[in-house]
């Protein structure tokens, strides 16, 4: 577990090294490339997926040796999905602190600079790139759904604890597709009532054969 703690801490340290000077100077600093964005998502969340998978295999379940690597890979992508949602949902708040997790290299492809994301009128220019990252997040969420399918049916609590963040994540992506994320006044998030509804639905789904796969398929982002 110390290894994974170190990875998470290393992500936070890199965060401070990258963005500390920008925050102090009142400027906005962006991650340089998509590879650095992916590395950040791995360090702060993908590594948690590895730790969670390791603990599950040691204490709650078993898989054939040839399936374990696949399980870990999907666990990493599960964590990355949740971190990507945080990044894509919290753009205005991060910008206020001088942090832009949207890679500068990608922004340049659309003739944008990090500062341009401070103006919500630039949403139309930003939308194509933003949709690319929502698509990537959906791919990670699909891996998370496949991860859940690998969990034993008898492990109700384990499945439920994985299903709820995926259901909320799927719904969040759907909301982010249509809202203006650059408008700091338009806070985009899943409501408490929706979360309570998902909690009830997933409990029913766990009791019905095939219910888990159905609810996760029905709930995924289909807005494109």
Task: Give the residues covered by each predicted segment.
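Active-site flanking residues adjacent to catalytic metal/cofactor-binding acidic residues
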Residues: 89
């Amino acid at each position: 577990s110390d290894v994974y703690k170190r990875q998470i801490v290393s992500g936070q340290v890199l965060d401070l090294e990258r963005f500390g000077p920008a925050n102090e100077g009142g400027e906005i600093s962006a991650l340089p490339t998509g590879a650095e964005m992916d590395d950040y998502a791995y360090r702060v969340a993908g590594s948690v997926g590895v730790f969670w998978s390791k603990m599950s295999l040691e204490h709650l379940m078993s898989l054939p040796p040839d399936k374990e690597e696949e399980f870990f890979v999907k666990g990493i992508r599960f964590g990355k999905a949740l971190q990507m949602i945080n990044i894509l949902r919290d753009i205005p708040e991060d910008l206020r602190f001088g942090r832009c997790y949207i890679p500068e290299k990608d922004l340049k492809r659309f003739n944008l600079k990090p500062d341009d994301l401070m103006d919500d009128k630039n949403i139309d220019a930003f939308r194509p790139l933003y949709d690319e990252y929502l698509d990537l997040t959906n791919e990670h969420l699909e891996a998370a759904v496949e991860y859940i399918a690998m969990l034993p049916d008898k492990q109700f609590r384990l499945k439920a604890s994985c299903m709820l963040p995926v259901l909320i994540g799927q719904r969040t992506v759907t909301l982010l597709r249509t809202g203006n994320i650059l408008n700091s006044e338009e806070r985009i998030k899943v409501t408490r009532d929706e979360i309570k509804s998902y909690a009830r639905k997933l409990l029913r789904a766990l009791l019905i054969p095939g219910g888990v796969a159905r609810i996760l398929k029905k709930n995924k982002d289909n807005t494109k």
